[in-house]
Regions:
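NAD(P)-dependent short-chain dehydrogenase/reductase
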Residues: 148-195
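NAD(P)H-binding glycine-rich loop region in Rossmannoid oxidoreductase-like domains
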Residues: 50-92
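Short beta-strand/loop motif that positions the catalytic acidic residue
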Residues: 508, 514-516
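Amphipathic terminal alpha-helices
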Residues: 279-330, 555-557, 561
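N-terminal Rossmann NAD(P)H-binding glycine-rich loop of SDR-like oxidoreductase domains
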Residues: 3-23
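Terminal hydrophobic/aromatic helix or amphipathic segment near a protein terminus
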Residues: 229-274, 293-296, 451
């Protein structure tokens, strides 16, 4: 067996296993519960060389396969840990791995993952001052180095900085989540605070190279070019279209203020410093292996897209690719194919593009589904929605079917009148301008706090739809700063344009199809084919997606004949 990885189901461990397997190595993965195999399969990794073994590093180890390289990526990371809980993994566990590695006759290297703020310290760490996590990591680092010298174990310590990438929802991710939700009123630290990053892909490639390098090294693996924290947060804010805090609070003041006021856990504050780190040896090893770090700004933007898509660990993206793009001045959240979609799907209120997930799964060909400007995850624009739509479709090289829902139907009609050559057909699902107006309460300012406080269950009940991931996604957006207010404004704006939209509908020159639910029927006569789905309400694509897809397909076949 080439290598064994402890902590193989963790964020670093699982990616390291994937990297080693991709390199053709035979890998033993030490797990308590095997969630690793399914994750590797989801990443398309060939697991023929993988052996999963059960083990608990908090206990003395035995019965594990003989290997050449040992990686300990296991750690108990959390703030507010008890001392014994933290030491069990970060000190005792680290020593148990080392003691077992020392018995291996063919051991080439023990690679111990420490931390950029905890390595190369002396003395006994102060648990009361540092907190259990950081203190236990410091103690474990010192203990592993000392015991390795005693047992003459070939050891390399790798000290990564803040590791970012898909699936990372702790550490810096919590700061980004506060920024995204509008809770980050001021930046912690000062103008020179340095919180370096490294991507998970780069880190595991680096780790895979370590056993062939000389033993006894300490490698600080981080991007020296990471922007200082204020600039870093500003870059993420610009990318995601949210305001960046203009004020900062010095760490010294944060330590003195009550946690209820600052929202900052005391243990997080020691990571906010202006320190720099000795990266020369790590950069030399990377250069010899041909490894290059991706630009920090690009890595942060890609990670921010991943965080928003996954709702910071609370959900799973329903389609890829996804991310923020500038459309008519709006940082717009876009899901799907931007260049050759067969269908372009525009959501209605109060939903976002996730509304279309059940229908999209039943449609042939690629789709493009954005969040409308100012709604869902998209930032606002000063342009009319139809102008924004024209810019959204400017890279599109096909003539897709434009499918709009509810209040998006008005802008879709205006776009179809102005740009008939850009689309092949217009489908209006529950067009609000042809239906009864929304209740007065939904248009009032009283609706704003109600929407912000609504649980997903209450929202689903109000809309008459199942409480699925689509509704949970919408409820999460409505809690963000400004979204509920913009939804209420959009309801009023849409109502004011009903007469204009009805008049423009007769000027659309491409084929038009209308789909409504029987409990939310049309209240105005139309000269276009209209389909009524029995038992459906205002959101037939959620409650009856198969029937909506069937009607869309039937119309396409008819047009193609």
């Amino acid at each position: 067996m080439d290598a064994i990885v402890f902590g193989a189901t963790g964020f670093i461990g699982r990616s390291l296993v994937a990297e080693l397997l991709t390199r053709g190595q035979r890998v033993a993965a030490v797990v308590r519960n095997d969630t690793l195999t399914s994750w590797l399969a989801s990443q398309g990794v060939d697991t023929a060389g993988l052996v999963s073994v059960t083990g608990d590093i908090t206990q003395p180890l035995s019965g594990l396969p003989e290997v050449r390289d040992v990686y300990n990526t296991a750690a108990r990371f959390a703030f507010g840990l008890g001392v014994q809980e933290a030491r069990a993994t970060n000190v005792t566990g680290a020593l148990n791995v080392l003691e077992w590695a020392a018995t291996l006759p063919g051991l080439r290297r023990l690679v111990h993952i420490s931390g950029y703020r905890v390595s190369a310290t002396d003395g006994h760490p102060d648990y009361a001052e540092l907190g259990a996590y950081e203190a236990s990591k410091m103690e474990g680092d010192l203990a592993v180095r000392a015991r390795a010298r005693e047992l003459q174990v070939p050891l390399t310590i790798v000290n990564p900085s803040t590791v970012i990438g898909p699936g990372q929802y702790i550490g810096l991710a919590t700061l980004v989540e506060d920024l995204w939700s509008g809770r980050l009123r001021a930046l912690p630290g000062g103008p020179d605070t340095f919180l370096p990053i490294v991507t998970i892909d780069y880190l595991v490639k680096f780790l895979a190279e370590v056993p062939a390098s000389p033993a006894g090294e300490h490698y600080w693996v981080l991007d020296d070019n990471t922007a200082l924290l204020p600039e870093l947060i500003r870059a993420i804010a610009d990318h995601t279209g949210v305001p960046s805090p203009r004020r900062s609070v010095p760490v010294g003041l944060l330590r003195r203020l009550p946690r209820k006021l600052t929202g900052a856990h005391p243990e997080t504050l020691s990571f906010l410093s202006a320190d720099c780190y000795p990266t020369v040896s790590a950069r030399a090893l990377a250069a010899s292996a041909g490894l290059e770090m991706p630009p920090a700004a690009d890595a942060l933007r890609a990670w921010a897209d991943e965080l928003v898509a996954a709702r910071f660990g609370a959900a799973s993206p329903w389609m890829s690719p996804y991310g923020f793009h500038t459309v008519a001045g709006s940082r717009t959240w876009v899901t799907g194919e931007r260049h050759q979609p067969d269908h372009v799907l525009l959501h209605g209120l109060p939903m976002n593009a996730d509304l279309w997930a059940p229908l999209a799964a039943r449609l042939p060909g690629p789709i493009l589904a954005p969040d409308l400007p100012g709604l869902g995850r998209s930032a606002t624009t000063t342009q009319p929605v139809e102008t924004w739509l024209a810019d959204l479709l400017s890279p599109v090289r096909t003539r897709p079917v434009l499918v709009a829902h509810s209040m998006a139907c008005g802008p879709a009609v205006r776009f179809a009148v102005d740009h008939p050559d850009r689309i092949s057909r217009l489908v209006l699902v529950s067009p609000s301008f042809l239906q009864a107006p929304a209740p007065r309460l939904a248009r009032s300012r009283l609706a704003i706090p109600m929407m912000r406080r609504m649980s997903a269950a209450r929202l689903a009940h109000t809309l008459g739809v199942p409480e699925g991931p689509e509704v949970r996604s919408t409820a999460a957006d409505l809690r963000r700063s400004g979204v509920a207010r913009r939804v209420a404004t959009a309801v009023r704006t849409d109502l004011a344009g009903h007469h204009r939209s009805r008049a423009l509908l007769d000027r659309v020159s491409v084929p038009v199809q209308i789909i409504v639910g029987s409990t939310d029927p049309l209240v105005a006569a139309v000269d276009h084919p209209a389909t009524e789905i029995a038992g459906a309400g205002h959101y037939p694509q959620l409650t009856h997606p198969a029937q909506v897809a069937r009607h869309l397909g039937a119309a396409s076949a008819s047009i193609g004949e």
